[in-house]
Amino acid sequence: MCSQIAIELNDTGVTVRDEFQLLLESPGYIIDCSGQEWIGKEARDRAQLFPNECNNRFWFELAQSQANAVNQSNAKLVLRHLASVWQQVSSNATSVILTVPATFTKTGLGVLLGICKQLAIPVRAMIHHAVLVPRQSDYTGLTIHLDMQLHQTAITLLQERNDEFSVSTVELLDDIGFASIYTTAAEYIAQVFISATRLDPMHDAELEQQLFNSLPVWLEQAQSQGAVQCRLQYQNNTYEAIVDAHGLIAGLKLKLNKIINILLSFDSKQAAIACVPEMIDKQLGFSSYANKHGIMVRRLGLGYHAQQSFLHAKQVISNDAQVYLIKQLPCATLTDPLPRLTNNSLATSHQQATHVLYNHRAYPIEDILYLVEIIGVELQLQNHQSSEAQNALLVIRKKSSQLLIEITNGNCIKVNDQEIKSYAQVFIGDCIRVNDYEEQLMLIKVEQ
């Protein structure tokens, strides 16, 4: 009996479906350590234990391949990952639809198809993720596809014409993905553990692995709870820290704001629906950020693009040896109600920060905190009056229920990439950059 499957690719990993169910999810991780190999979930769950032997960038780098500059080691890792996936799902599969993100270059797609041919994967069609999103019935605004992956985010504006979706504009953010988001969240939680227990989870491989394995659950809990109870096991002891959900979520605000700014840049005067991975909403509360700016959000579940590809199978399947990327398809119309606009996320609550996070150390603000520049030490935070404090670059001061940042001596100070001329009110999650320093300071809340 012949069967058809769809393989959904991005640099987070590989998802495989048939027409009726999810068959496999394999994260884009490989560990090769002294002859021992782990691929997919087994590798991801050991990534912090073997940081030098773990690779999770091969899909990302293959996707960005340029002509005459294909990294063969990345291609070999993609081949090994796909071979592992194909071995598990190939039984009776005689036809495969690939769905791919906007991040793939033509060269990257060519290498990918060559790898599929080498593995005897019978690819019959290849579809751009964005054109698989649903069209909302009786809706005339913008439809935007947001594809957050492990190391990057692709944002695609769709054009609708004659009941078809086609790719109009693509914006790429190579510095925002789940990897950078998890790292930011892990550093915040680690600082809370240090303050509460003196245990630094980032300085022990097994502890760090525990932390990263727990992050998705803790981030989800932070969307509905005021505080998250985090536990780690170390040397037969249990260490516990209560993490303020507001601070944890707000610490990711700068990254989400970059995404929102791109969504608004398309046409802020029109209504917009953003179709996003369910994970970005469940773990980061993306809907509340988007809703605050009038953008509705449609959540796409795991393997959504693979599932939707079956609606177009008869139209796109080709017996021709040549397979081309399909970037235009008839719209699949939804009759569900429009997504609702809400604005009740914990992340939007303005709470007062208690500490400044700088170089992995949390400095208490108390009543006043001076940022000074010391030759040989670079930046230093002080909460007492000193000779250096008289020439402070900036001052963070509590004033009744507000937390204010005051600029001194004509320094260039930016809060969330916006230059501050004299003073400004600041909140949990705000990021401060000073003059030409690469390091940033982040306002956080640490439970006492």
Regions found by a protein language model. Name each.
Residues E8-D11, T99-T103, D147-Q149, C275-D281, ...:
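Structural motif
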Residues T12-T99, G226, C230:
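Conserved phosphate-binding loops in N-terminal lobes of ATP-dependent enzymes
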Residues A75-T140, A154, E160-N162:
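Active-site neighborhood for divalent-cation/phosphate handling
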Residues A83-V96, S195-D204, L256-I273:
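Phosphate/pyrophosphate-binding loops at sites that engage ATP/ADP/AMP, CoA/4′-phosphopantetheine
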Residues Q159-A245, C275-I280:
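Phosphate-binding glycine-rich/basic clefts of nucleotide- and phosphate-handling proteins
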Residues E220-S345, S349-Q351, D367-L371, G376, ...:
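Helical "lid/coupling" subdomains associated with nucleotide-phosphate turnover
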